[in-house]
Amino acid sequence: MNSTQRDLIAGEVSKALARKVIPKDIMEAHDRGAIKLHDLDYFINPIYNCELVNLEDMLQNGTVINNKLIEKPQSIKTAMNIATQISAQVASSQYGGQTISLTHLAPFVRISKEKIENKFAKYPMLPEVRDQIIEDELKIEIKDAVQTFNYQVNTLQTCNGQSPFMSVCIYLNEDPEYAYEVALLAEEIFKQRIQGMKNKFGIEATQTFPKLLYFLDENNTYEGSEYFWLTQLAVKCTSIRMNPDYMSVKKMKEVIGYAFPTMGCRAILSLWFDDEGNPIFYGRGNLGVQTVNLPFVALEAKRDNKDFFEVLDKYLDLCRRMGEIRYNKLKGVKAEVCPILWQYGAISRLNADDDIIDVIDKKGFTVTLGYSGIYEATKVTKGVSHTTEEGHEFALKLITYLEDKCKEWKANNPHTRWALYGTPQESTTDFFCKAIRREFGEVEDVTDKGFITNSYHVDVREKIDAFSKFSFEATLQDHSLGGAVSYCETYPMQKNPEALLQVVQHIYENIMYGEINFESDTCGVCGLQGVMEYVDGKWTCPQCGNNDIKQMSVCRRVCGYLSDDGTWNEGRTKDIINRVKHL
């Protein structure tokens, strides 16, 4: 696409200019692959990574898009349509993911209901008949609103030719007053997601956006709770479409103190409170990520006969300096650089000539230290998997060390609010693996498999059941409070939703954030809806032999998001085809 090509060219220019600004020693560590400076293709622009969009402010108080005033909507259909327009504008103004909340849309369900009630108030009829008509009319409007929302999110394009990387928070108790309205919206979203969205072959396939974040709480997790029916529908949806994903209110409150959504696929904000002591989540964001290649560190320490943590400190300091560079380059930037964010409510309501750094400071934007390959680093250092007792002890020591470094940096420089982040590694898994191979040659259980394991995750080849995997990874996720997510791999579970429900309830009790992965593919030649096989370097339909990637949809969890194009880098593809089933 022309827009994508233009963005790629601009990205190469940005990378070249970034090399003239970033200190030589930091750039050299990136080039060697000891660290990864993410999103250098956007570095020269005064923009940031990801955010929680303050949709409530924008819908209730109005916003401006393309110099046109958008006033408070008067129906759920209009509100959801405006939400997609906001999302596209926000996505074109940053380079990471974004999250909106159904709680901010729920009041407009009530407005629509009141309009329907007024419409039928003048007609004489039995109260129970009127109530049924009102309910039916409201559900029709919600259905139309959700359908428009889905089509908009999946057909709108940002300035780089992509759909907005949007997540939707579905948290019934985020504002208990609107729990019922949130449930009505979620019900319709799940129903339409189950049905699927027709792809270019006319097959109802799994839609990739928006990502759905469903919060498990006391009122929806177990049989007998008020909204258990909605969780049953959510599980059915997951069993077919790999969405929603699940966040545990119980565990988040135990570990963090509050429950709130991720920014996009996994980034989590640090706590920040306003002058009245109220926690603030929406209208905040993250300034960027730099990731340390832990198996690279382990191999360098082993080669040079040095202490692992001594070598680690060297590369961590480079990451710290890079994070401060990201913060400092936003100093002096005026709000007019991106009105939708800084002037019209997504983040703040500044005047055009106000400095954005004041909001970044006052609202506690985070900077993140990413990490990759705890499994491989443990294998190099201790000779065992981190699922063993000895390996787990080292892994806990390592992730706690990284967590403490973030606390130390934040204390020394309160402007950079550091948080520890389990890097998604969509491309980094390949980048790091090849970097290690260049520096150290082929290394068993590190480079020979062709990829580096995501963050603290269990090696994708290791046999372990879903319940044990989530329980084990929870001990490490609890320290990765700048963002992390755990997965389990299953077969498609349409015929066994009861088993999947047990996994979901296990997530509620044991881990803050979990997802379920399986294959959801379609063949555009024969119409097969099943699993494409990877044969001789090509995805191939087992029914008709079609191996033209343009004539099929291969849908997998690539990082936190789903992807259905099947054209992933070598490392990510090897990760995907090596995944064992946990259920």
Briefly describe each language-model feature range.
Residues 370-373, 482, 560, 571:
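Glycine-centered flexibility sites
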Residues 367-380, 400, 557:
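Contiguous, well-ordered alpha-helical segments that form the cores/surfaces of helical PPI scaffolds
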Residues 1-363, 384, 388-554:
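Conserved catalytic cores of very large enzyme subunits
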Residues 543-583:
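Long insertion/accessory domains within large nucleic-acid-processing enzymes
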Residues 140-150, 379-380, 563, 572, ...:
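Metallocofactor- and cofactor-centric catalytic cores in central/energy metabolism, strongly enriched
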